[in-house]
């Protein structure tokens, strides 16, 4: 099977669907791997690093799409990218079909098989393919780091000769994968952390991480 990774066109997107290392694993399984020129540049992978791994680097998206059976991306494809694909080809990417119903209809009309990585269920059997949770974990961590950078003072409390500085108070709304990552990061930075979720049953998990669960006024703590 011929697998190709497109360069991401979204402004600021630095990720790439296939790295030289992952390409090596695919080739060991007997597949041919292609990447569009410059696809990995913003992720720190030069075209030469792909060539050294045995990957074929092609100059354009159109040529890559014509050359492969499976097209891999990180973000959802554009209408133009879908338009260049042929019946029988497979697309693997984040797709968000509920938000991109017209794009999904276009793919269906052209006879393209679309595998939406954002729809992979969070079960043990699919854990290695759960790219969405991995990205959510990073997003939760990064959100707190960015907030701390813009906060203007320490997250943790300080005791100095000049007096005390109280810890920052952080409220995390939502205790999904990203929220739990944000809670863990905030606690590790020394903040006083509060968290809310519409599911009161997650209170124990939140409190086990060192945060305080915020109940709605009508809820009773058992």
Residue ranges and their predicted role:
Residues 179-180:
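N-terminal Rossmann-fold NAD(P) dinucleotide-binding loop
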Residues 63-65, 83-86, 161-166, 185-187, ...:
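Solvent-exposed alpha-helices and their adjacent loops that cap or buttress functional pockets
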Residues 2, 8, 79-169:
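Glycine/serine-rich phosphate-binding loop and adjoining beta1-alpha1 elements at the start
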Residues 34-45, 189-216:
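NAD(P)-binding Rossmann-fold cofactor-contacting core
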Residues 219-222:
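Conserved small/polar residues in nucleotide/adenosyl-binding loops
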Residues 174-176:
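Glycine-rich Rossmann-fold phosphate-binding loop(s) that bind the pyrophosphate
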Residues 1-106, 110:
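An N-terminal-biased, well-structured beta-alpha scaffold segment characteristic
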Residues 28-32, 55-56, 70-73, 109-113, ...:
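Generic secondary-structure signature for well-ordered alpha-helical cores
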């Amino acid at each position: 099977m011929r697998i190709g990774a497109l360069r991401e066109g979204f402004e600021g997107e630095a990720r790439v669907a296939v790295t030289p290392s992952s390409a090596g694993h695919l080739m060991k399984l007997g597949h041919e791997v292609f990447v569009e020129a410059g696809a990995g540049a913003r992720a720190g992978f030069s075209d030469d690093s792909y060539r050294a791994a045995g990957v074929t680097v092609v100059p354009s998206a159109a040529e890559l799409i014509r050359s492969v059976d499976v097209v891999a991306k990180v973000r959802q494809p554009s209408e133009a990218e879908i338009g260049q694909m042929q019946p029988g080809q497979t697309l693997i990417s984040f797709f968000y079909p509920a938000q991109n119903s017209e794009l999904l209809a276009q793919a269906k009309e052209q006879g393209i098989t679309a595998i939406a990585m954002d729809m992979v269920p969070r079960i043990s059997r699919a854990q290695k393919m759960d790219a969405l949770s991995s990205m959510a974990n990073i997003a939760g961590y990064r959100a707190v780091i960015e907030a701390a950078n813009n906060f203007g003072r320490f997250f943790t409390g300080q005791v100095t000769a000049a007096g005390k500085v109280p810890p920052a108070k952080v409220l995390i709304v939502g205790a999904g994968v990203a929220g739990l990552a944000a809670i863990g990061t905030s606690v590790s930075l020394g903040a006083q952390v509060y968290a809310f979720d519409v599911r009161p049953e997650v209170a124990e998990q939140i409190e086990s991480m060192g945060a305080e669960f915020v109940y709605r006024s009508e809820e009773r703590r058992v």
